[in-house]
Amino acid sequence: MAPLHFTILILFSFVIVVSSSSFTPPRHPFDPLTETELKLVRTIINKSYPVGPNHKFTFQYVGLNEPNKSLVLSWYSSPNHTIKPPPRQAFVIARDNGKTREIVLDFSSRAIVSDKIHVGNGYPMLSNDEQEASTELVVKFKPFIDSVAKRGLNVSEIVFTTSTIGWYGETKAEAERVIRLMPFYLDGTVNMYLRPIEGMTIIVNLDEMKVSEFKDRSVVTMPIANGTEYRISKLNPPFGPTLHNAVLLQPDGPGFKVDGHIVRWANWEFHISFDVRAGIVISLASLFDTDVNKYRQVLYKGHLSEMFIPYMDPSDDWYFITYLDCGDFGCGQCAVSLQPYTDCPAGAVFMDGIFAGQDGTPAKIPKVMCIFEKYAGDIMWRHTEAEIPNLEITEVRPDVSLVARIVTTVGNYDYIVDYEFKPSGSIKMGVGLTGVLEVKPVEYIHTSEIKLGEDIHGTIVADNTVGVNHDHFVTFRLHLDIDGTENSFVRNELVTTRSPKSVNTPRKTYWTTKPKTAKTEAEARVKLGLKAEELVVVNPNRKTKHGNEVGYRLLHGSAAGPLLAQDDFPQIRAAFTNYNVWITPYNRSEVWAGGLYADRSQGDDTLAVWSQRNRKIEKEDIVMWYTVGFHHVPSQEDYPTMPTLSGGFELRPTNFFERNPVLKTKPVKVTTARKCTPKND
C-alpha cells in the first residue's frame, strides 16, 4: 500500500507522460489494445475482407473484447497473478459494403473467432474520417455554393459540424445511414458556433458519400462576430479578475505510482484504460483495509456509458438535435489532449490514447488522460473539543484525493469527466460542462421585442443570438463488487413516525429507517426526489463485527430527469434516462445504455428494454446505472464561452469498515517557501 505523501512545498514543477504504445506486451487483462495489436487486427481483417473499388470496408469501432469475468477474477486473486490470464481478444464493428459487421479476433491464434452481420436497427458510431469527408463533399456541391453566394458569403469562411438526425418513426429501410451538416461562418472570429447559417438542410449519405438532400428554405440574418472572441491573446483590456500564480509541489514526489495501467495510491489500487467510445475505464478498484491487512473489492468496472443531449426547439433547424454523444460520436474518439498545468496540475501523470482510424491504422491522442493528487483545501476530518474543563483539543486532517481525468469535446461542448478516489474509501464521479453554447439567430436584441405568446426556446444572450434550452444526461455504468460478486440493492426509506403514546416525551414525531431489499429489477428503478431514502449496495454475505451488512451508499447529485413525453421519439431512444438509478444483473453484452448501435436507433436495445425482463437482482452480480442530469436554461454569463457547470455523485462506504478508515492518518508536514505571507492591502 502506497503511503500518503502530505509534505507540501513550492519548489519546481514537472509533468510525466506515459505512452500507451509502450505497453507491449500487455500485462493485464484490461489493458487497452496496443498499437501493435491494432496493426495486427487491421492485417488479419484486411486479409479476410480485401478492400477494392467495389468493396468498401471501414473500421467504426475497435476495442478490447470483454474477457470472461470469472477468468479475470481467478487471475487477479492468484498470488502474483501466476494463473494464465484470459484469452485476449479484440471486438470490431465495421461497415462492409453497406452492412454492419461484428468481428471478434483472438490474438493468441491470430484468427477471427466470430463474425456476424448486425440485422437490427441502428448504425455504429461515426468515424472522424467520414465526417471530414462529408464536409469536403458539401463545399464542392454546386447548389450549396449557389446558396452561399445568394447570402453574399464567402465559401472559404464556412466551416461545418456534423449531426446525427435521430429517428422519427421511419422503418429500418427508410432510416438510411445519413448525417446532417450544419454550416457556420467565421469571417472575423474562431468562435464558429456563435455564427450559425440557418435556413439550409444538408443531408449526406455516408455509405454512398453523396449529398442525398439539399434544401434552401430561407435566408436568416447571422449574429455578428463582434464580442465572440475567447482567445486571451486576442482580447483587450480591462482584464480580470486577477489571480495570483501558485505552484503546488511535493518534495518527496507524487504519492501515487503508475505501473503500466495499474495505479496505486494511499489505500487504493485500480486499473485505468482508454476506450474510443467510453473514454476512461476504471477496473478492479480495490481498497486496502489495515484491520484485515488486505485489499477488498469495490468496483469491478466503471465508465461513461452514454450521454443524451436533447435541444428544446422543434423547428426545422433544430428538432433533430437530440444527440447520443458516446454512441454517435465516441466520447473517447472526441477526447482531446490535456494541457499541463491548466487542465491538470503540476505533478500529473499523462497517458496517451490509442485507437483505430477508419482504415484500421492506429491513431494516437497524446496526453488524453491525466492522473494527479488534488489538494483543494478541503478537510478530511476535524474536531475541536472545548467542553472539557482546562483542556482544549483540536485535531484536523487536510483532505487529499487522487483524480483520473479526461476531457471530451463533442462539437461545441467540452465535458470534463473526473474519477476521484478518496482515502476515506469514497469514489466521486464528477462531470463539468463548459465550452460554447449552441445558439440560433433571431431578429431580437432585447426581450421587450419578443412578440406576445412567442416562444424563442431559450434566452437572448447577445444581439440577435438565442442560447437554446437543452438537457444533458450523463449515464455511468458501475459494475460494483462490494467485497465480492454477490451483492444486493437496499432502498432504505426514511419515514416520519409518530412518537408512541407509551413514551413520555414532548416530541410528536421523529424519522426512522425502513430498509427494503430489491428482489427484481423493477423494484430497483429509482426516480430521485420522490421520497427520502438512502440507496445502498450491500454484500449480505459479509457483515461487520456489529452485524451490519458491508456496503456502499450512493450520494446522488441533481435529481433532474427528462421532461420530454414518453412517446416522443428522442425519449423512446433515450428511455434509459426515465429513471435516475437502475440496477441490473451483470450481462457482458449490456454495456451501452442507449444500445450498441445508437445512431438512428429505435430504442429497442436500451437499458430500459433490458430491464423489462425484470430479472432477479438479490444476492447477484449486479450493475448500477446512474444518470447525472442537467436542465440548462442558458444565461448571458454563458456567452461567449461558458464557465464550468459541475455535477456528479459519490459512492461512499457504509459499514464497509469497522471504524473511520482515516482515523490514524498522520497530520501533514507543511514546508513553506518564500513569499507565502499574504500581503495586506
Swiss-Prot record:
Enzymatic reactions: a primary methyl amine + O2 + H2O = an aldehyde + H2O2 + NH4(+)
Segment forming the signal sequence: none
Locations listed in the record: Peroxisome
Protein family membership: Belongs to the copper/topaquinone oxidase family.
Gene Ontology CC terms, in alphabetical order: peroxisome
Main location: other
Database matches in InterPro entries: Cu_Am_Ox_Cu-bd, Cu_amine_oxidase, Cu_amine_oxidase_C, Cu_amine_oxidase_C_sf, Cu_amine_oxidase_N-reg, Cu_amine_oxidase_N2, Cu_amine_oxidase_N3
Main enzyme class: oxidoreductase
Role of this protein: Copper amine oxidase that can use putrescine and spermidine as substrates. Involved in putrescine catabolism in peroxisomes.
Disulfide bond entries: 344-370
Biological process annotations from GO: putrescine catabolic process; response to abscisic acid; response to auxin; response to jasmonic acid; response to putrescine; response to salicylic acid; response to water deprivation; response to wounding
Gene name of the encoded protein: CuAOalpha3
Residues that bind Mn(2+): 481, 621-622
Claim: Hydrolase is one of the keywords in the record: no
Keywords, sorted A to Z: Copper, Disulfide bond, Manganese, Metal-binding, Oxidoreductase, Peroxisome, TPQ
Entry comment on modification after translation: Topaquinone (TPQ) is generated by copper-dependent autoxidation of a specific tyrosyl residue.
Annotated positions binding Cu cation: 470, 472, 632
Tissue specificity of this protein: Mostly expressed in stems, and, at lower levels, in flowers and leaves. Mainly detectable in stipules, hypocotyls and roots.
Name of the protein: Amine oxidase [copper-containing] alpha 3, peroxisomal
Entry keyword annotation includes Secreted: no
Catalytic residues (UniProt): 325 (proton acceptor), 413 (schiff-base intermediate with substrate)
